Design a protein with these regions (language model features):
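Beta-strand/loop substructures that line and gate deep hydrophobic ligand-binding cavities in soluble
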Residues: 78-131
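Hydrophobic ligand-binding cavity/cleft-lining segments
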Residues: 1-41, 145
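Short, surface-exposed coil-to-beta transition loops
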Residues: 2-3, 59-63, 85-90
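Glycine-rich portal/gate segments that line the openings of hydrophobic small-molecule binding cavities
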Residues: 36-81, 96, 134-145
Length: 145
């Protein structure tokens, strides 16, 4: 299980605003090239995002669905990442003085990713998630009033 955390220098409400805006995900989610559609009720439980992911010229269209939403503090997604299967991606926001401690927990649930889970997979997820949290921090603080 790949768990990382980052202190973001803005209040939890600002970080939540970024998580709650499906249109921003291409700005900070590593590998996401473009958001194709965000359900109007995002991030309500059951709402989805359709997006294009890829590396270089190789791209795929994938989706994610909200599984748990506690506005302002917790968002859990199930992301489909073909051909690898699905993954659980959980964000927890904790107030930390005037800032936000974001805990990101990601692990494969189904498919090839779940079957090959081990140290190499964990390393890739840790590197990806470190970069993703840094992007989230930049997005949240850049847009802060």
């Amino acid at each position: 299980m790949a768990q990382r955390q980052q202190l973001i220098e803005c209040p939890p409400a600002r970080v939540w605003d970024v998580l709650a805006d499906g249109g921003t995900y291409a700005q900070w989610v590593v590998g996401t090239k473009e958001i194709l559609h965000a359900d109007n009720d995002w991030p309500a439980v059951g709402a989805g995002l359709r997006f294009r992911v890829g590396l270089g010229p190789l791209t795929f269209e994938d989706t994610c669905v909200v599984r748990i939403c506690e506005p302002g503090s917790r968002l859990e997604l199930e992301a489909k990442a073909e051909p690898f299967g699905t993954a659980r991606i959980a964000f927890t926001l904790l107030p930390w003085a005037d800032h936000t401690l974001v805990i990101l927990d990601e692990h494969p649930l189904r498919g090839l990713g779940a079957r090959i889970q081990g140290p190499p997979t964990e390393l890739v997820l840790h590197l990806r998630n470190r970069h993703m949290l840094a992007n989230l921090a930049r997005t949240a603080t850049k847009e802060a009033p």
